[in-house]
Amino acid sequence: MIFQIFSALLIGFLIAFAAIPFLIGYLTSRGEVGVERSGKHGFGVDTSGKNGTPSMGGVTFILSSLFATLIVMFLFRLDSLNIIFFIVSFLSFGLIGLIDDALKVFYHRDEGFRFIPKLIAQIISAALITIILVAVHIPDKLTFPFFRALPLYFLVQFIFYLVWFVGWSNAANFVDGIDGLLAGIALLIFAGYGIIGIKENQNLMVIFDFSVVGSLLAYFIFNRPKAKIFMGDCGSMALGAGMAINAIFLQHPWSLLWFGLILALDTTSVMIQVLVYHFFHVRVFPVAPLQHSFQRAGWSEWKIDSLFWTIQLIITMIGVFVWIK
């Protein structure tokens, strides 16, 4: 298994590392880059220094992760239809984000994919994945923390998994926005689930997760502050869906509330901010999502990244330790 993990890491890294400079050069040469319309971002932070930075970098680690997974499966003669879950999850939500990015980058529509059409597309993708899960793999029981497994009827199961995919793909999208932040957090989450997969003898899941880790390591080289490329919605939404399929594949979806705690808190801060301001015209946080509050307070992106990565590392280590024990 160690050699398979190393192969997944290395192949994912090499493919992404080779592809990213090509994408940066292609988008830059065409002038198809993200440009801030003013010196101040919507969060009240000066981001004019990011003008001219290409986006859509998520395409590289999505494809490199999947290619690496398939290559390792072929090399080690691993045959499993379960790969369908990971491919459909990663590609479908990545495609939705890619459409959003393309509208912004190539057609210069600031809002990209409008909210309602985007939500409908997410629901359709989540429904497709859920139907496959319910029909092929996942048992009709749901494990709750500190409670026995409860039976799930099809409709309840369908709604739960649908909400899970849509929710986590958007949660990852909220966290993206500071150079390197989501890439580092996601890398640790996928590494954690990969280690758990070893304990649970889920070889395919292990290969997929470490293919993602290798691809993200390569992407991080180009995305760390000051970023040479942004992942865009295609990357963030695919990562969120990938986290969700990991938790569901282990038949412990609630585990993602721990491993994805930063994502959950970030999303909660946005919901609280919007609701309280709507009804009482008061802002609970200086800015939401939370990372931008630190940014407005004058923290550098490296300092914010270091704080969030350290917290995520602790969360991941505790989660893996508790699971293994």
From Swiss-Prot:
Where in or outside the cell it occurs: the entry states: Cell membrane
Q: Which InterPro entries match?
A: Glycosyl_transferase_4, PNAcMuramoyl-5peptid_Trfase, PNAcMuramoyl-5peptid_Trfase_CS
> GO CC annotations?
plasma membrane
Keyword terms of this UniProt record = Cell cycle, Cell division, Cell membrane, Cell shape, Cell wall biogenesis/degradation, Magnesium, Membrane, Metal-binding, Peptidoglycan synthesis, Transferase, Transmembrane, Transmembrane helix
Q: In which pathway does it act?
A: Cell wall biogenesis; peptidoglycan biosynthesis
Cofactor dependence? Mg(2+)
Kindly state which reaction or reactions the protein catalyses. Answer: UDP-N-acetyl-alpha-D-muramoyl-L-alanyl-gamma-D-glutamyl-L-lysyl-D-alanyl-D-alanine + di-trans,octa-cis-undecaprenyl phosphate = Mur2Ac(oyl-L-Ala-gamma-D-Glu-L-Lys-D-Ala-D-Ala)-di-trans,octa-cis-undecaprenyl diphosphate + UMP
Q: What is its main location?
A: membrane
Membrane protein topology class: Multi-pass membrane protein
* Gene Ontology terms: biological process: cell division; cell wall organization; peptidoglycan biosynthetic process; regulation of cell shape
Q: Transmembrane segments in this chain: where?
A: 5-25, 56-76, 83-103, 119-139, 149-169, 178-198, 203-223, 228-250, 304-324
MF terms per GO, please?
Answer: metal ion binding; phospho-N-acetylmuramoyl-pentapeptide-transferase activity
Protein name according to UniProt: Phospho-N-acetylmuramoyl-pentapeptide-transferase
Q: Which organism is it from?
A: Oenococcus oeni (strain ATCC BAA-331 / PSU-1)
Gene symbol of the encoding locus = mraY
